[in-house]
Amino acid sequence: MVNVQTYTQRAESHQSPVAQRLFKLMDSKKTNLCASVDVKTTSEFLSLIDKLGPYICLVKTHIDIIDDFSYEGTIVPLLELSKKHNFMIFEDRKFADIGNTVKSQYSGGVYKIAQWSDITNAHGVTGSGIVQGLKEAARETTDEPRGLLMLAELSSKGSIAHGKYTEETVEIAKTDKEFVIGFIAQRDMGGQDEGFDWIVMTPGVGLDDKGDSLGQQYRTVDEVVSTGTDIIIVGRGLFGKGRDPDVEGQRYREAGWNAYLKKTSQV
Protein backbone atom coordinates (compact mmCIF):
# COMPACT_ATOMS: atom_id res chain seq x y z
CA MET A 1 0.00 0.00 0.00
CA VAL A 2 1.37 3.41 -0.99
CA ASN A 3 2.32 5.60 1.99
CA VAL A 4 0.13 8.71 1.93
CA GLN A 5 1.51 10.36 5.07
CA THR A 6 3.17 13.75 4.70
CA TYR A 7 6.93 14.09 4.93
CA THR A 8 6.48 15.92 8.25
CA GLN A 9 4.44 13.07 9.71
CA ARG A 10 7.01 10.52 8.57
CA ALA A 11 9.90 12.57 10.01
CA GLU A 12 8.23 12.60 13.42
CA SER A 13 7.96 8.81 13.66
CA HIS A 14 11.00 7.55 11.72
CA GLN A 15 13.72 5.63 13.56
CA SER A 16 16.58 6.80 11.33
CA PRO A 17 18.11 10.24 11.97
CA VAL A 18 19.13 10.35 8.30
CA ALA A 19 15.55 9.79 7.17
CA GLN A 20 14.26 12.30 9.71
CA ARG A 21 16.64 14.97 8.44
CA LEU A 22 15.82 14.21 4.81
CA PHE A 23 12.05 14.38 5.30
CA LYS A 24 12.32 17.67 7.20
CA LEU A 25 14.58 19.12 4.50
CA MET A 26 12.16 18.03 1.75
CA ASP A 27 9.27 19.68 3.55
CA SER A 28 11.12 22.94 4.24
CA LYS A 29 12.43 23.29 0.66
CA LYS A 30 9.27 21.84 -0.89
CA THR A 31 11.18 19.46 -3.09
CA ASN A 32 11.48 15.71 -3.62
CA LEU A 33 13.99 16.07 -6.47
CA CYS A 34 17.36 14.32 -6.46
CA ALA A 35 19.85 15.50 -9.09
CA SER A 36 22.05 12.79 -10.57
CA VAL A 37 25.19 14.65 -11.61
CA ASP A 38 27.33 12.33 -13.74
CA VAL A 39 30.06 14.44 -15.32
CA LYS A 40 33.80 13.89 -15.64
CA THR A 41 35.42 17.05 -14.29
CA THR A 42 35.30 18.61 -10.85
CA SER A 43 34.63 22.08 -12.25
CA GLU A 44 31.55 20.98 -14.22
CA PHE A 45 30.41 18.82 -11.29
CA LEU A 46 30.52 21.69 -8.81
CA SER A 47 29.12 24.23 -11.27
CA LEU A 48 26.05 22.10 -12.04
CA ILE A 49 25.41 21.35 -8.37
CA ASP A 50 25.64 25.05 -7.51
CA LYS A 51 23.00 25.80 -10.18
CA LEU A 52 20.71 22.92 -9.21
CA GLY A 53 21.18 23.28 -5.44
CA PRO A 54 18.16 25.52 -4.77
CA TYR A 55 15.78 22.98 -6.33
CA ILE A 56 16.95 19.68 -4.83
CA CYS A 57 16.81 17.75 -1.58
CA LEU A 58 19.58 15.39 -2.58
CA VAL A 59 22.48 15.17 -5.02
CA LYS A 60 23.43 11.72 -6.33
CA THR A 61 27.05 11.20 -7.26
CA HIS A 62 29.17 8.63 -9.04
CA ILE A 63 32.35 10.03 -7.60
CA ASP A 64 34.62 7.50 -9.33
CA ILE A 65 33.91 8.89 -12.82
CA ILE A 66 35.46 12.27 -12.03
CA ASP A 67 38.82 12.29 -13.81
CA ASP A 68 40.46 14.98 -11.67
CA PHE A 69 39.04 13.89 -8.30
CA SER A 70 40.72 14.91 -5.07
CA TYR A 71 39.23 15.05 -1.60
CA GLU A 72 40.27 18.65 -1.04
CA GLY A 73 39.36 19.81 -4.53
CA THR A 74 36.12 17.87 -5.07
CA ILE A 75 34.61 16.77 -1.75
CA VAL A 76 35.37 19.79 0.42
CA PRO A 77 33.66 22.19 -2.05
CA LEU A 78 30.77 19.72 -2.43
CA LEU A 79 30.20 19.76 1.31
CA GLU A 80 30.29 23.56 1.27
CA LEU A 81 27.63 23.59 -1.47
CA SER A 82 25.48 21.17 0.55
CA LYS A 83 25.47 23.68 3.40
CA LYS A 84 24.93 26.68 1.10
CA HIS A 85 21.89 25.17 -0.61
CA ASN A 86 20.70 22.79 2.15
CA PHE A 87 20.75 19.42 0.40
CA MET A 88 22.04 15.97 1.36
CA ILE A 89 24.49 13.75 -0.53
CA PHE A 90 23.95 10.24 -1.91
CA GLU A 91 26.94 8.38 -3.37
CA ASP A 92 25.52 5.81 -5.79
CA ARG A 93 28.27 3.27 -5.11
CA LYS A 94 26.15 0.10 -5.45
CA PHE A 95 28.28 -2.01 -3.12
CA ALA A 96 28.11 -5.71 -3.99
CA ASP A 97 30.70 -7.71 -2.03
CA ILE A 98 31.07 -9.53 1.27
CA GLY A 99 30.78 -7.53 4.48
CA ASN A 100 34.49 -7.29 5.27
CA THR A 101 35.34 -6.05 1.77
CA VAL A 102 32.62 -3.41 1.55
CA LYS A 103 33.61 -2.19 4.99
CA SER A 104 37.02 -1.22 3.59
CA GLN A 105 35.60 0.08 0.31
CA TYR A 106 33.16 2.35 2.14
CA SER A 107 35.49 3.76 4.77
CA GLY A 108 38.83 3.91 2.98
CA GLY A 109 40.54 3.94 -0.39
CA VAL A 110 40.78 7.07 -2.49
CA TYR A 111 37.18 8.22 -2.02
CA LYS A 112 36.54 7.70 1.73
CA ILE A 113 32.80 7.66 1.03
CA ALA A 114 31.65 7.17 4.62
CA GLN A 115 33.30 10.43 5.63
CA TRP A 116 31.15 12.66 3.41
CA SER A 117 28.15 10.88 1.90
CA ASP A 118 24.95 10.89 3.98
CA ILE A 119 23.51 7.97 2.03
CA THR A 120 24.90 5.14 -0.08
CA ASN A 121 23.45 1.96 -1.58
CA ALA A 122 24.08 -1.75 -2.04
CA HIS A 123 22.95 -4.81 -3.95
CA GLY A 124 21.44 -7.69 -2.00
CA VAL A 125 23.24 -10.38 -3.98
CA THR A 126 25.80 -11.18 -1.24
CA GLY A 127 23.28 -11.38 1.61
CA SER A 128 22.69 -9.45 4.82
CA GLY A 129 26.39 -9.30 5.75
CA ILE A 130 26.75 -6.36 3.40
CA VAL A 131 24.44 -4.31 5.62
CA GLN A 132 26.41 -5.11 8.75
CA GLY A 133 29.76 -4.41 7.07
CA LEU A 134 28.66 -1.01 5.82
CA LYS A 135 27.06 -0.10 9.15
CA GLU A 136 30.26 -0.95 11.03
CA ALA A 137 32.32 1.13 8.60
CA ALA A 138 30.04 4.13 9.09
CA ARG A 139 30.13 3.81 12.87
CA GLU A 140 33.94 3.53 12.94
CA THR A 141 34.52 6.37 10.45
CA THR A 142 32.25 9.21 11.51
CA ASP A 143 29.98 10.49 14.26
CA GLU A 144 27.54 11.74 11.61
CA PRO A 145 24.48 9.56 10.93
CA ARG A 146 24.53 7.52 7.73
CA GLY A 147 21.85 5.65 5.79
CA LEU A 148 21.74 2.78 3.31
CA LEU A 149 19.42 2.11 0.38
CA MET A 150 19.04 -1.41 -1.01
CA LEU A 151 18.74 -1.85 -4.77
CA ALA A 152 15.42 -3.63 -5.12
CA GLU A 153 14.55 -2.70 -8.72
CA LEU A 154 16.33 -0.94 -11.59
CA SER A 155 15.01 1.18 -14.47
CA SER A 156 17.13 -0.37 -17.22
CA LYS A 157 15.65 -2.66 -19.87
CA GLY A 158 16.35 -6.34 -19.21
CA SER A 159 17.22 -5.87 -15.53
CA ILE A 160 17.08 -9.10 -13.52
CA ALA A 161 16.33 -7.16 -10.31
CA HIS A 162 12.69 -8.23 -10.00
CA GLY A 163 10.54 -11.04 -8.63
CA LYS A 164 12.32 -13.33 -6.18
CA TYR A 165 15.46 -11.18 -6.17
CA THR A 166 13.46 -8.12 -5.14
CA GLU A 167 11.63 -10.09 -2.44
CA GLU A 168 14.91 -11.35 -0.96
CA THR A 169 16.38 -7.84 -1.03
CA VAL A 170 13.41 -6.58 0.96
CA GLU A 171 14.05 -9.31 3.53
CA ILE A 172 17.68 -8.14 3.84
CA ALA A 173 16.44 -4.59 4.43
CA LYS A 174 14.40 -5.83 7.37
CA THR A 175 17.57 -6.86 9.23
CA ASP A 176 18.35 -3.26 10.23
CA LYS A 177 15.58 -0.75 10.85
CA GLU A 178 17.81 2.24 11.58
CA PHE A 179 20.63 1.97 9.01
CA VAL A 180 18.60 0.70 6.03
CA ILE A 181 16.34 3.64 5.21
CA GLY A 182 14.78 2.40 1.98
CA PHE A 183 15.22 1.30 -1.60
CA ILE A 184 16.11 2.17 -5.11
CA ALA A 185 12.91 0.88 -6.69
CA GLN A 186 10.12 1.63 -9.12
CA ARG A 187 7.25 1.38 -6.63
CA ASP A 188 6.29 1.12 -2.97
CA MET A 189 8.07 -1.81 -1.27
CA GLY A 190 5.54 -2.39 1.53
CA GLY A 191 6.65 -3.06 5.09
CA GLN A 192 4.24 -0.66 6.79
CA ASP A 193 2.31 -3.48 8.44
CA GLU A 194 5.58 -4.58 10.09
CA GLY A 195 6.53 -1.10 11.29
CA PHE A 196 8.89 -0.12 8.47
CA ASP A 197 8.76 3.25 6.72
CA TRP A 198 11.06 2.84 3.77
CA ILE A 199 12.01 5.73 1.52
CA VAL A 200 11.66 4.85 -2.16
CA MET A 201 13.95 6.66 -4.59
CA THR A 202 13.31 6.13 -8.28
CA PRO A 203 15.67 6.70 -11.21
CA GLY A 204 14.54 6.76 -14.81
CA VAL A 205 12.12 9.66 -14.37
CA GLY A 206 11.56 12.03 -17.28
CA LEU A 207 9.13 14.72 -18.35
CA ASP A 208 10.12 14.52 -22.02
CA ASP A 209 12.15 11.45 -23.06
CA LYS A 210 11.04 7.82 -23.04
CA GLY A 211 14.50 6.22 -23.03
CA ASP A 212 17.95 6.07 -24.57
CA SER A 213 19.99 3.76 -26.81
CA LEU A 214 21.62 1.99 -23.84
CA GLY A 215 18.47 0.56 -22.28
CA GLN A 216 17.34 3.32 -19.94
CA GLN A 217 13.54 3.52 -19.71
CA TYR A 218 11.83 6.67 -18.42
CA ARG A 219 8.54 7.00 -16.54
CA THR A 220 6.66 10.21 -15.80
CA VAL A 221 6.79 12.03 -12.47
CA ASP A 222 3.08 11.53 -11.76
CA GLU A 223 3.31 7.84 -12.62
CA VAL A 224 6.17 7.03 -10.23
CA VAL A 225 4.94 9.16 -7.32
CA SER A 226 1.43 7.70 -7.52
CA THR A 227 2.87 4.18 -7.20
CA GLY A 228 4.99 4.91 -4.14
CA THR A 229 8.06 6.94 -5.08
CA ASP A 230 9.18 9.45 -2.45
CA ILE A 231 12.15 10.97 -4.30
CA ILE A 232 12.52 11.30 -8.06
CA ILE A 233 16.06 10.91 -9.44
CA VAL A 234 16.74 12.95 -12.57
CA GLY A 235 20.01 13.33 -14.45
CA ARG A 236 20.19 14.25 -18.12
CA GLY A 237 16.72 15.75 -17.98
CA LEU A 238 18.19 18.51 -15.82
CA PHE A 239 21.35 19.37 -17.70
CA GLY A 240 21.58 17.36 -20.94
CA LYS A 241 22.33 18.96 -24.28
CA GLY A 242 20.23 22.07 -24.85
CA ARG A 243 18.81 22.09 -21.31
CA ASP A 244 19.15 24.94 -18.81
CA PRO A 245 19.71 23.54 -15.26
CA ASP A 246 17.94 26.51 -13.67
CA VAL A 247 14.85 26.08 -15.85
CA GLU A 248 14.76 22.29 -15.64
CA GLY A 249 15.53 22.24 -11.92
CA GLN A 250 12.51 24.42 -11.23
CA ARG A 251 10.36 22.43 -13.67
CA TYR A 252 11.14 19.04 -12.13
CA ARG A 253 10.92 20.39 -8.59
CA GLU A 254 7.42 21.70 -9.25
CA ALA A 255 6.32 18.50 -11.01
CA GLY A 256 7.61 16.30 -8.20
CA TRP A 257 6.16 18.44 -5.44
CA ASN A 258 2.76 18.72 -7.09
CA ALA A 259 2.64 14.94 -7.53
CA TYR A 260 3.47 14.52 -3.82
CA LEU A 261 0.73 16.98 -2.80
CA LYS A 262 -1.73 15.05 -4.95
CA LYS A 263 -0.67 11.69 -3.47
CA THR A 264 -1.03 12.96 0.10
CA SER A 265 -4.36 14.69 -0.65
CA GLN A 266 -3.01 18.17 0.12
CA VAL A 267 -4.52 19.61 -3.06
From Swiss-Prot:
Its EC number is 4.1.1.23. The keyword Membrane does not apply. PROSITE patterns: OMPDECASE. This is Orotidine 5'-phosphate decarboxylase. It comes from Scheffersomyces stipitis (strain ATCC 58785 / CBS 6054 / NBRC 10063 / NRRL Y-11545). Gene3D superfamilies: Aldolase class I. It catalyses: orotidine 5'-phosphate + H(+) = UMP + CO2. The gene is URA3. The keyword Protein biosynthesis does not apply. Substrate binds at residues 38, 60-62, 92-101, 218, 236. Keywords: Decarboxylase, Lyase, Pyrimidine biosynthesis. Pathway: Pyrimidine metabolism; UMP biosynthesis via de novo pathway; UMP from orotate: step 2/2.
